[in-house]
């Protein structure tokens, strides 16, 4: 098992898999999820060194993973969090545990085995941008006119 809590010994239950993916999708599209994603993008863009670590929230040198970047931005004391406790991390960041697990999976496991911290930063930033819901200007204009 990994920090994400995902396991490789899937029992083939498509229904449970669909339920899990549905929870992840709802978490990412919800108000709290979108707020975290926007904060994450801002935190990533503000990083002086465009590098993301894996397997930890923050190192003693101050390097962070994707969720850790939000922790720095929001002033979360990450030394008190167990990076392998999805529920605890989710609570500290006001997101669903399914979202915490998915971000950790993307950060730690979705990239190539020999991925550099710089490449991880680039991949995660692109992924975060694809998950942020944008409202077309025309939709905002139509609402304010009507």
Enumerate the language-model features and the residues they cover:
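Short, glycine-biased loop/turn motifs at secondary-structure junctions and
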Residues: 1-146
């Amino acid at each position: 098992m990994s920090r994400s809590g995902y396991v490789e010994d899937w029992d083939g239950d498509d229904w449970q898999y669909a339920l899990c993916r549905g929870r992840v999708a709802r978490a990412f599209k919800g108000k709290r999820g979108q707020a975290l994603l926007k904060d994450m993008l801002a935190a990533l863009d503000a990083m002086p060194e465009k590098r993301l670590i894996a397997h930890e929230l923050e190192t003693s040198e101050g390097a962070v993973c994707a969720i850790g970047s939000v922790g720095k931005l929001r002033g979360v004391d990450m030394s008190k969090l167990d990076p392998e406790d999805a529920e605890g991390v989710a609570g500290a960041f006001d997101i669903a545990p399914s979202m915490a697990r998915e971000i950790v999976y993307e950060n730690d496991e979705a990239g190539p085995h020999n991925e550099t911290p710089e490449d991880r930063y680039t991949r995660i930033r692109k992924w975060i941008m694809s998950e942020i819901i944008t409202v077309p200007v025309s939709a905002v204009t139509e609402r304010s006119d009507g």
